[in-house]
Amino acid sequence: MFAVIKTGGKQYRVAANDLIKVEKVAGEAGDIVEFAEVLMVGSTIGAPTVAGALVTAEVVEQGRGRKVIAFKKRRRQNSKRTRGHRQELTTIRISEILTDGAKPSKKAAEKKAPKADAAEGEAAKPKKAAPKKAAAKAESAE
């Protein structure tokens, strides 16, 4: 079974275990992402999306595409400009194509709240006193 999903302003025809490069999607390697904007599943066409359809995918890697050179030259004016751009891309592997509101077998990664707790724990620790070696060197120099 295949589906057509929309992400990053583009449409992609995907099937299970497909490996595709899409515009940057939030998440790190190994995270599970969900695409709820499914335009078509098999022979079912959405208007504009298919109700209850969901595509889950695993982030394989975050990377950047090839450099695109934008070169502008104004003839007979001794004027030119070169600019380069590399688009950020995410490589994903399609895990499942779900219909009729079915639940995914793997949960999508939730927001990382433990990091905030760790930051609070570090702030609660008292600062250590300055090392005594610096004071000893200052006394010996006098």
From Swiss-Prot:
Keywords per UniProt: Ribonucleoprotein, Ribosomal protein, RNA-binding, rRNA-binding
Region called Disordered, residue ranges: 74-142
GO molecular function: rRNA binding; structural constituent of ribosome
The organism's place on the tree of life at top rank: Bacteria
Biological processes, Gene Ontology terms: translation
One Pfam family hit: Ribosomal_L21p
Basic and acidic residues composition-biased segments: 107-125
Compositionally biased residues, Basic residues: 74-84, 126-135
Gene Ontology cellular-component terms listed: cytoplasm; ribonucleoprotein complex; ribosome
NCBIfam families xrefs: L21
Function: This protein binds to 23S rRNA in the presence of protein L20.
Assembly and binders: Part of the 50S ribosomal subunit. Contacts protein L20.
Family statement: Belongs to the bacterial ribosomal protein bL21 family.
UniProt name for this protein: Large ribosomal subunit protein bL21
